[in-house]
Amino acid sequence: MARQKKYSGKGGARKKNKQKQSVAPRRRVEFKYKGFTLEELQEMPIKKFMEIVPSRQRRTMLRGITPNQRKLVMKIKKARRLTNRGKEPRVIRTHCRDFVITPEMIGLTFGIYNGKEFKEIKLVEETVGRFLGEMAPTRSVVQHGSPGMGATRGSMFVPIK
């Protein structure tokens, strides 16, 4: 016959106390980028925004924009106008992975090309100051299946099902 554990009675009391405590609702922490709120960032001129981003992004922005990036800016402005009217803008598809995410792009959905397909990404507050390419990785982990018949020397002696 199996021996039973002696019950000390302490564990049950702790559980009852935990049930009595009420859990406070979690408050969402207000987003800040380098001490600025999203509203302050959106009102900020682009020159001032360039001063607070890291040096790599600042250097990219100082070099100017290419014709492809200019097209992307026009698409962003068009999508912003649609959202101001209350319409849902379409996904903005782009190959520009080296474009810095600015505060005016927050809330829009982008299709970023990763070399094979367009990854749909909805930009949130935490992505400000990063590159679009960081949001759509170009490499993925390959999951190989089991090797087929004749793939290895040892499989020559395995009977076929």
Curated annotation (Swiss-Prot):
Q: Name one GO biological process term.
A: translation
What Gene3D superfamilies would the database entry show?
30s Ribosomal Protein S19, Chain A
Reading the lineage from the top rank, the first entry is Archaea
Question: One GO MF term, please?
Answer: structural constituent of ribosome
Q: Which Pfam families match?
A: Ribosomal_S19
Region (Disordered) residue ranges read: 1-26
- In this chain, composition skew of type Basic residues spans 1-19
Q: Which keywords accompany this UniProt record? A: Ribonucleoprotein, Ribosomal protein, RNA-binding, rRNA-binding
Q: Report the GO terms under cellular component.
A: cytosolic small ribosomal subunit
Entry-linked PANTHER family = RIBOSOMAL PROTEIN S19P FAMILY MEMBER, SMALL RIBOSOMAL SUBUNIT PROTEIN US19
What does this protein's UniProt record list under function?
Protein S19 forms a complex with S13 that binds strongly to the 16S ribosomal RNA.
Q: Which HAMAP family match?
A: Ribosomal_uS19
Family assignment from sequence similarity: Belongs to the universal ribosomal protein uS19 family.
Q: What is this protein called?
A: Small ribosomal subunit protein uS19
**In the UniProt record, what gene is named as encoding this protein?**
rps19
